[in-house]
Amino acid sequence: MQKSADTVRVNVQLIKAASDSHLWSDTFDRKLTDILSVETEVAKTIADQLRAKLTGDEQQVIAAKPTSNPQAYDSYLRGLAYMLKTAFTPENSLGAQKYVKEAVRLDPNFALGWALLSYVDASGYLTQSLQPTAALREEAREAAETALRLQPNLGEALLATGFYHYACLKDYDTALKYLEQAQRVLPQSSRVLQGLAFVERRRGNWDKSEAYFQQAEKVDPRNVNLLSQHARSYVCLRRFPEALAKLEQILNITPDDIDTLVLKARIAQAEGDLPRAAALLAPLRLGVGYVNALETQVYQAILESRPGPVIAELKEILAKPDQTLGFYVGELRFWLAWAQEVAGDHSAARESWSQARTELESFLKEQPENVVLIGDLALTNMALGDNTAAMTLAERAIAMMSVEKDALTGPRPLDILARVAARTGDPDRAISTLEKLLSIPYEAPLAANPPLTPALLRLDPMFEPLRRDPRFQKLANPQP
């Protein structure tokens, strides 16, 4: 798109994604005040080029003008662009939220904008890429309700409502009801299919989730967020070759994408290939918004027993912490303390853990259902020698989130429990929990989230107290 004074030129190309072959191109010139009409004209022209027969509903969707305010639509598109990135990071979710809030401020009747705001808030609540407070959950609900009130048959509003029930309430039956309604209005929407894949994944229906991901990718083969989520399913299932193949697809579309390279590194760690992980992580220069990526670099240094450089990096970041990260500041300080402990600086580690505990506890009152935060506190108390508090917190997390309710992240508290039990003198409980974890797919609580593997049991120093136990040795060195 090119802009000159009050005129805009839009250059459009139609490319067959499967073969990257050129099918059609054209140029559209419009006044800036009429820019929104281009979208309808382009959609109709593409349908003609593809000789697609549009249903009445589809013609109405194409003809609809989502807002009469070009600035609101511009903000909406900027927010949407953040949501189409590969990962739900604080940086991406905060960026999306900022622009979409501006869109609905500029046009309070912008139903599509309200629907996207609900989706941004709900996904941020679920993934903790936004601070998962009751206020955020309420904002997601109100935005979805506003979108439906403004346009009751808007597919994106139905999608947002379904996603709210899925992400904020874990009410999967109601979520499916709305997603299926959205699918009838938007039969070719990859976001609806992705939503269905998400719900089935949390239900533990991994094969059904896989089928929805495959359908979505046929519709939208260059959607890197979709491809990344599909890859993460493979990671949780420990199907690492398939995950890596999917990540290569992403890198062909967005070369050098940081979140994709970090996930490749975590797979290498999970497979016990630390040199390969190091080669992927070494070139990355990370801002503070890349929390998972930073933690993956620290984890690499811990696994290698070479934490010196990352200690200096974390100290610099935490000297002036970004308060928009919320509880992640305390989580990063936990990682600093762990690195200091591995480096042998026990007094500095204890000081950092004490500060981390204070920072994390300050968020617990307004985020009482944040299982990630509770897990962080359990590990921090464990490190400080408060075994009773550590175990109480781990068991609190387990009571809040079960594997039966959430097959994807429900096992996370068990991962925390295994670590706490290993370090607090309860090897029987640690090993029985590890046996269960190694037998199921899940998204782990630490760094970029691959589940525990035999290789990680061998490398992770948190399991050092179990090293001489024959039962642990059997888990860490399984026979082929």
Model regions: which residues?
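Low-complexity, Gly/Pro
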Residues: 365, 372, 419, 474-480
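Acidic-histidine catalytic/liganding microenvironments
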Residues: 107, 151, 440, 460-463, ...
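Acidic, proline/glycine-rich low-complexity intrinsically disordered segments
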Residues: 1-340, 345-369, 374-377, 386-389
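Terminal, low-structured helical/coil segments at or just beyond the last alpha-helical repeat
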Residues: 451-480
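Acidic, Ser/Thr-rich low-complexity linear motifs
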Residues: 62-65, 130-131, 323-327, 362-370, ...
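Sterile Alpha Motif
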Residues: 412-445
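TPR/TPR-like (Sel1-like) alpha-helical repeat modules
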Residues: 285-289, 354, 395-399, 431-442
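Hydrophobic, well-ordered secondary-structure elements that form the walls
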Residues: 378, 418, 430, 466, ...
